[in-house]
Curated annotation (Swiss-Prot):
Presence of keyword ATP-binding: yes
Binding site for (R)-pantoate: 60, 152
Subunit structure: Homodimer.
Protein's recorded name: Pantothenate synthetase
InterPro entries: Pantoate_ligase, Pantoate_ligase_C, Rossmann-like_a/b/a_fold
Amino acid sequence: MQIFHNLNEWIRFRNSLSPDLSLGFAPTMGNLHAGHASLFLASSKENHYTVSSLFVNPTQFNNPDDYKHYPRTVDADLELMTQNGVDFCILPNENEIYADGYAYQVQENRFGQLMEGKHRPGHFNGVLTIVMKLFNLVKPTRAYFGEKDYQQLLLIQGMVKALFMDIEIKSCPTVREKSGLACSSRNNRLTPSQREIADEFAKIFHQNKSSAMISKELEALGITVEYIEEFQGRRFAAVKIGDIRLIDNYLL
């Protein structure tokens, strides 16, 4: 795997590639897990080359403490990429990515204001802006995103369509642990006792009950429920176990 620490170096290399070659792209913030690996493998099966990026994007954290405590595990992340078909990895720094000081932003004013957008003001502005910047840098044929962040996936699909971007957005199924808990970088921050509660959250959330009944059962376990909502035939949830925030969704 070839690693690029400098954006100009990457741009020169990208421009040297034949336009006949397909590039798959799976952007990440690091602290990788099996869900990320599934994106890399899906890309490597469908493209000549697979590109990823490691960048903890400060503009999508509405809580500064979340950004501060987000695990940085670069060496392990690069190893996982190497083992799962990534050919090129971009490791940009914040000054390069936000040379404009975040003066220019991508904003969606409808669906992005619901659920995650309502509870994390500014979050999706940061997500869409960094994804747009990375798309312009990588110029991928296809880009891969997990269904765990389903609202994010829909917004990225919408952005690509609205702005006439010639990129195919591929959705990949949520990867889950044996307990049914969705793989997430945040899971690593759970204490053993919190982890048991998180496993119960996954089980209860997937029960065939009303959202109100599910909320009541979760709250009885000491879980803070931010929302459980249904949208376009899916059920979405965001909860807090201690100070660890977890999200999930599934098709009804």
